[in-house]
């Protein structure tokens, strides 16, 4: 574990492996430890960089910057600090809010974008309709975050994982429990017009049993992302990388081999 002080945040991160750089951006139920099933898989061919967003793990905002600084700005400064000019970004859920704006605004820095269970901060009528229809699921997840429950159904994984993989369900909740109370909020402000000149190779993946950000929402995001490809994973909830790591790693590996080979 390494801590660095940026202008707006102290960031907890880890670097493993060698080769072209991949940054893994976790979701709201995790932190840099969440990627324990991905880093060993990719570190022989890629430099794997994991970090915790401010207020997650051991990362924190400096001087209450969370109300005025976006996660994408933190990521850009983080990359600059590490002197990484070009990178592949792997975004899980909330991590899409971190990564998609960077791919839109600075395509020369982002070689490839892998969007897992996330529409990022995209807003379209279809995405907004799906988000509204799924508000109950989001509320359940919010309560789980706040209460830090470890022994009950965690919406970020899903009921199937709770039943079929109780040890994984427990581990996920234990990692989640390392996070701090969250004060920052995510903006939803990218429009289809903002995506008109988009040119970053992008794949969206979605679990067909996702109750947090459902497949209809992810499909709608893929539809307005030029050149994007959509993959659906059956019998899987919101956290494909955690529930079905072999499937996740194979999909990501195939994408990287084509767009960002080691």
Where are the regions that the model predicts?
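Active-site loop/oxyanion-hole signature of alpha/beta-hydrolase fold enzymes
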Residues: 40, 49-90, 250
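Acidic catalytic loop of the alpha/beta-hydrolase fold
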Residues: 209-213
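Conserved HGGG/HGGXW glycine-rich cap/lid loop of the alpha/beta-hydrolase fold
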Residues: 9-61
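Short beta-strand/loop motif that positions the catalytic acidic residue
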Residues: 198, 204-206
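Flexible "cap/lid" loop of the alpha/beta hydrolase fold
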Residues: 97-105, 110-142
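Catalytic active-site module of serine/aspartate enzymes centered on a nucleophile-bearing elbow/loop
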Residues: 228-262
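Conserved alpha/beta-hydrolase catalytic His-Asp/Glu region
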Residues: 124-125, 129, 142-197
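Short alpha-helix in the alpha/beta-hydrolase fold that links the catalytic acid
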Residues: 200, 214-223
């Amino acid at each position: 574990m390494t801590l660095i002080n940026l202008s707006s945040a102290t960031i907890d991160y880890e670097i493993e492996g060698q080769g072209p750089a991949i940054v893994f951006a976790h979701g709201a139920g995790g932190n840099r430890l969440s990627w324990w099933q991905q880093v060993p898989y990719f570190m022989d061919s890629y430099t794997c960089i994991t970090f915790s967003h401010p207020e997650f793990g051991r990362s924190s905002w400096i001087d209450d910057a969370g109300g005025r600084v976006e996660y994408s700005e933190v990521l850009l400064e983080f990359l600059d600090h590490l002197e990484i000019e070009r990178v592949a970004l792997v975004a899980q859920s909330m991590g899409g809010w971190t990564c998609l704006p960077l791919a839109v605004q600075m395509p020369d820095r982002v070689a490839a974008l892998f969007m897992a269970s996330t529409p990022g901060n995209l807003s379209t009528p279809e995405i907004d309709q799906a988000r509204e229809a799924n508000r109950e699921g989001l509320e359940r997840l919010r309560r789980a975050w706040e209460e830090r429950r470890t022994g009950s159904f965690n919406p970020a994984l899903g009921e199937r994982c709770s039943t079929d993989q109780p040890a994984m369900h427990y581990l996920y909740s234990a990692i989640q429990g390392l996070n701090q109370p969250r004060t920052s909020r995510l903006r939803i402000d990218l429009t289809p017009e903002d995506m008109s000149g988009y040119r970053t190779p992008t794949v969206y993946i979605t679990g067909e049993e996702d109750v947090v950000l459902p497949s209809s929402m992810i499909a709608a995001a893929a539809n307005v992302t030029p050149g994007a490809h959509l993959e659906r994973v059956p019998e899987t909830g919101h956290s494909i990388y955690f529930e079905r790591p072999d499937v996740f790693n194979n999909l990501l590996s195939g994408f990287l081999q084509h767009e960002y080979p080691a």
